């Protein structure tokens, strides 16, 4: 049975190989896809849980959710955003908490990240996944938060 991975944010789909960070583009942490978030309005938006499961790791700029079958999805909010020390992010959940797909996990402002000189792109990674098992949405397509971003066989 395949796992449907929802987009944590609304925006435009980007191939992981086009993410301007070698850790992600080189698939060092795993295969996946990315989304350039829609920063319209410049306000805070919620980054959603891409799957139902347990939050196994959470930081202000990133989180991992593991489902009951042991599949883990990493959502990383922007590049080099760890350098912000949590500024611009509001964590809404905690490690060990069970969440349903589509539940808000972190509020953040992609426009604020961008105005600070950082890239707000959001890599969504299948940790310990095989690229051949993933079917990501095609690049350059618009995706809404909560819509299917990729499937993991």
Which stretches of residues belong to each language-model region?
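Contiguous, well-folded functional domains in the mature portion of proteins
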Residues: 1-153
């Amino acid at each position: 049975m395949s796992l449907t991975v929802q987009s944590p944010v609304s925006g435009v789909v980007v191939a992981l190989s086009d993410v301007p960070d070698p850790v992600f583009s080189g698939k060092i942490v795993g295969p996946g896809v990315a989304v350039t978030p829609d920063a319209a309005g410049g306000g805070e938006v919620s980054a959603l849980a891409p799957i139902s499961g347990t939050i196994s790791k959470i930081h202000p700029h990133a989180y991992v959710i593991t489902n009951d079958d042991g599949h883990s999805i990493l959502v990383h909010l922007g590049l080099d955003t760890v350098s912000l020390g949590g500024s611009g992010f509001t964590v809404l959940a905690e490690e060990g908490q069970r969440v349903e797909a589509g539940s808000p996990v972190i509020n953040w402002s992609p426009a604020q990240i961008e105005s600070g000189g950082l890239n707000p792109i959001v890599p969504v990674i299948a940790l310990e996944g095989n690229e051949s098992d993933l079917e990501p949405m095609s690049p350059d397509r618009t995706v809404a938060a909560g819509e299917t971003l990729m499937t993991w066989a």
